[in-house]
Amino acid sequence: MSSETYSATVIGGTGFTGGELLRLLAGHPNFEIAQATSRSKANKTVGHSHPNLRELDLRFSSPDDLESVDVIFAATPHGVSMEQIDTFYEHADTVVDLSADFRLNTAEQYEEWYDGHSAPEYLKKSVYALPELTRDELPGADLIASGGCNATSTILGLKPLFDADILSGDEDIVVDVKVGSSEGGAGGGAASSHPERSGIVRPYAPISHRHEAEIEQFLGVSVSFTVHAVDMTRGSSATCHVFPGQPVSKGDLWKAYRGSYE
């Protein structure tokens, strides 16, 4: 492991994603947290929003007062990073974005699945972060786009079947994803609160879920994709129903997944 230490800023540090980033970075031997930003909690301690990080000697600062660091991690809502990307690069050589702003390859995809893109010139330089499958592309990347949660669980579930030629891409694929309430974020609203979700199973975006775009881009196939909000807090569990054109044994499946992930 490298002994070099990198300075980092977490933009949007009060949300669930920002809090997890801060926790991971605080415990990482190669990172030093230089700054965490929050417009609503500026000057308050990180522990004010994340009690598990009370021992972290750090206060939130305004995102308008960015410091120069090695890496900026952006844990902001969709649309923020694409608007601020030039500013980010004025303060860091590497940007890791956890929103959907740089996951897709073309402006046309953003027109179809989102509301367009204000910085399409950055899309081709972005590397989709799925370390199990794109690890070799990540070192040295200037712009890293963290994959969507539901797309990640689906891609990891299906990719070994294509690599082992169990699937060719012509088959029907049905994906049913169960997700916890944290997926909606700290400001997810009533639909993500425990009283509203407890004991229920509810489909979310049953038609044209945006994570379908990432799955189709990465695997090159279309899937029938439905996400269900269920009574749990964390996690994304994808059940992928596939229909191979030839018999497949349990041993074939073990070999495919072990070959990909061991």
Which sequence ranges carry the predicted segments?
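N-terminal Rossmann-like NAD(P) cofactor-binding subdomain of oxidoreductases
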Residues: 1-204
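Charged docking surfaces used in two-component/phosphorelay signaling
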Residues: 168, 183-262
